């Protein structure tokens, strides 16, 4: 299936698990905000028509970008939860996005997305009536903990996967899934969970293990290490990440650069 898709990036969260005054999506790696790499990676795919970023109502860190890779970059006010922010993004999509069009949702603090993974997700997901998510098979041994901190047992890891992003679903089905979950008081932790509650079965598309979410200082250090390797030409997947240069903000335009304050960045 061909055609363009829009992407939604929920970025209204405060990143409390990371700590600090600055939300994690705005923390800098190699001099640029994490979210700059995230948005640049999404917009680099030829099938992505534009991106809606859901930000906090009092967000003073948003750089004011209006385009990335010459594609429109819109904002809307997000909600108190991830699900509320994604729903706000779905409702803020341009009028030309139809109810049955596929839409991508990607974590703001997941900056290491490879173009090849996104390409595979779009190819497989748009060929399915429901959609698909990037995911990685669980490879570690899983232990079930007791209340006292002891091991109560070992869980079989066969057929278990870690959900990654982006996730790809039809706009109207995701709106329905998120709305019904909210009405039922269910806190869905990803978009696939909302779709599953409708009785639908998205596909799993294997993605790279290094498409990780930055949630701790160690994760940030790991991403900076990836960037340093890329600069030295030592990253094995550099060809797949050609749209994510170290100076990620060079592909942005808008009100100001988070790094330089310039009109074009």
From Swiss-Prot:
EC code(s) of this entry: 2.7.7.60
InterPro entries given in the database record: IspD, IspD/TarI, IspD/TarI_cytidylyltransf_bact, ISPD_synthase_CS, Nucleotide-diphossugar_trans
Region (Disordered): 231-265
GO molecular function: 2-C-methyl-D-erythritol 4-phosphate cytidylyltransferase activity
Pfam families: IspD (PF01128)
Record keywords, A-Z: Isoprene biosynthesis, Nucleotidyltransferase, Transferase
GO BP annotation list: isopentenyl diphosphate biosynthetic process, methylerythritol 4-phosphate pathway
Pathway: Isoprenoid biosynthesis; isopentenyl diphosphate biosynthesis via DXP pathway; isopentenyl diphosphate from 1-deoxy-D-xylulose 5-phosphate: step 2/6
Bias (Basic and acidic residues) ranges: 231-241
Source species, domain of life: Bacteria
Segments of skewed composition (Low complexity): 253-265
Catalysed reaction equations from the record: 2-C-methyl-D-erythritol 4-phosphate + CTP + H(+) = 4-CDP-2-C-methyl-D-erythritol + diphosphate
Site keyed Transition state stabilizer: positions: 17, 24
Site label Positions MEP for the nucleophilic attack, positions: 157, 213
Record family assignment: Belongs to the IspD/TarI cytidylyltransferase family. IspD subfamily.
Reported function: Catalyzes the formation of 4-diphosphocytidyl-2-C-methyl-D-erythritol from CTP and 2-C-methyl-D-erythritol 4-phosphate (MEP).
Protein's recorded name: 2-C-methyl-D-erythritol 4-phosphate cytidylyltransferase
Species for this entry: Xanthomonas campestris pv. campestris (strain B100)
This protein's encoding gene: ispD
């Amino acid at each position: 299936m061909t055609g363009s898709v829009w992407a939604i990036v929920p970025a209204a969260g405060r990143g409390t698990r990371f700590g600090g005054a600055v939300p994690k999506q705005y923390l800098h790696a190699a001099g640029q905000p994490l979210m700059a790499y995230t948005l640049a990676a999404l917009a680099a795919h030829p099938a992505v028509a534009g991106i809606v970023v859901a930000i906090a109502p009092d967000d003073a860190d948003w750089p004011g970008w209006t385009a990335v890779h010459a594609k429109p970059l819109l904002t809307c006010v997000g909600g108190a939860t991830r699900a509320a922010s994604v729903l706000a993004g779905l409702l803020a999509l341009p009028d030309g996005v139809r109810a049955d069009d596929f839409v991508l949702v990607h974590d703001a603090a997941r900056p290491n997305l490879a173009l090849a993974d996104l390409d595979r997700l779009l190819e497989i997901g748009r060929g399915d009536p429901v959609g698909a998510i990037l995911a990685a098979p669980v490879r570690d041994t899983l232990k079930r903990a007791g209340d006292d901190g002891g091991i109560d047992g070992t869980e079989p890891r066969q057929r278990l996967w870690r959900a990654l992003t982006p996730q790809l679903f039809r706009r109207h089905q995701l709106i329905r899934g998120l709305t019904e979950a909210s009405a039922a008081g269910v806190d869905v932790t990803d978009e696939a969970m909302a779709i599953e509650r409708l009785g639908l079965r998205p596909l799993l598309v294997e993605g790279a293990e290094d498409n990780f979410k930055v949630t701790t200082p160690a994760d940030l250090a790991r991403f900076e290490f990836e960037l340093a390797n890329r600069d030295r030409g030592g990253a094995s997947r550099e060809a797949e990440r050609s749209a994510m240069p170290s100076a990620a903000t060079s592909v942005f335009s808008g009100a100001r650069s988070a790094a330089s304050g310039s009109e074009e960045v």
